[in-house]
Swiss-Prot record:
Expressed in roots, shoots, culms and young spikelets. Residues 45-80, 81-116, 118-153, 162-197 form the EF-hand domain. It comes from Oryza sativa subsp. japonica. This is Calcineurin B-like protein 3. Disulfide bonds: none annotated. Acts as a calcium sensor. CBL proteins interact with CIPK serine-threonine protein kinases. Binding of a CBL protein to the regulatory NAF domain of a CIPK protein lead to the activation of the kinase in a calcium-dependent manner. PANTHER family: CALCINEURIN B, CALCINEURIN B-LIKE PROTEIN 3. The gene is CBL3. InterPro entries: CNBL1-10 (IPR045198), EF-hand-dom_pair (IPR011992), EF_hand_dom (IPR002048). Keywords: Repeat. Pfam families: EF-hand_7, EF-hand_8. Induction: By salt and cold stresses, and abscisic acid (ABA).
Length: 225
């Protein structure tokens, strides 16, 4: 009886280990057609993007997942811990909120940066970047944080007086409801008047991603439609 129980115990242990390994095993490219239908990427682009994902995910730790440092190095050419913009983009990519990116998260979120992504998606994503507190509107302090961070990362030094003046003008134009905050509708109107606000929302190389890994793309298992 004891031997039987011990055998069951060992079997359970093996099963638990298998389950644990399965849970930790990152998901790869399971169905490029699904991602192609649900993003702006073609099937070939999804497959090429997966090759890019594998390179990025092995830059620091070769685990098939992208951590924040790998993400910043790949997309922003920096691993600065204080990069607020990069932090915000990573947090919005990380829909599972576990500090790492699987391929599907990476592909779906990166889709908004494609040159062919709908303008409304870019506007919505950029709004979320500035909505640091995730309240559904942008406050003055949030704008200041992003402006200060952007200036610091670009090596520009402006006095606090000049920065406050920039924010004053921004709210004077954007806050048409005069309630001290910028909601989604006001943000959209502001961006439409000043498209340059979205210049960071487009990564041109995504349009040419299939030429980055031509040998892989030529062997696509599914034809683009």
């Amino acid at each position: 009886m004891l031997q039987c129980l011990e055998g069951v115990k060992q079997l359970c242990g093996v099963l638990l280990k298998c389950c644990d390994l399965d849970l930790k095993q990152p998901k790869g490219l399971e169905d490029p057609e699904i991602l192609a239908r649900e993003t702006v990427f073609s099937v070939s682009e999804v497959e090429a993007l997966y090759e890019l994902f594998k390179k990025i995910s092995s830059a620091v730790i070769d685990d098939g997942l992208i951590n924040k440092e790998e993400f910043q190095l790949a997309l922003f050419k920096t691993n600065k811990k204080e990069s607020l913009f990069a932090d915000r983009v990573f947090d919005l990519f990380d829909t599972k909120h576990n500090g790492i990116l699987g391929f599907e998260e990476f592909a779906r979120a990166l889709s908004v940066f494609h040159p062919n992504a709908p303008l409304d998606e870019k506007i919505d994503f950029s709004f979320q970047l500035y909505d640091l507190k995730q309240q559904g509107f942008i406050e003055r302090q949030e704008v200041k944080q992003m402006v200060v961070a952007t200036l610091a990362e670009s090596g520009m030094n402006l006095s606090d007086e000049v920065i406050e003046s920039i924010i004053d003008k921004t709210f004077e134009e954007a806050d048409t409801k005069h309630d001290g905050k910028i909601d989604k509708e006001e943000w959209r109107n502001l961006v439409l008047r000043h498209p340059s606000l979205l210049k960071n929302m487009t990564l041109q190389y995504l349009k040419d991603i299939t030429t980055t890994f031509p040998s892989f793309v030529f062997h696509s298992q599914v034809d683009d439609t």
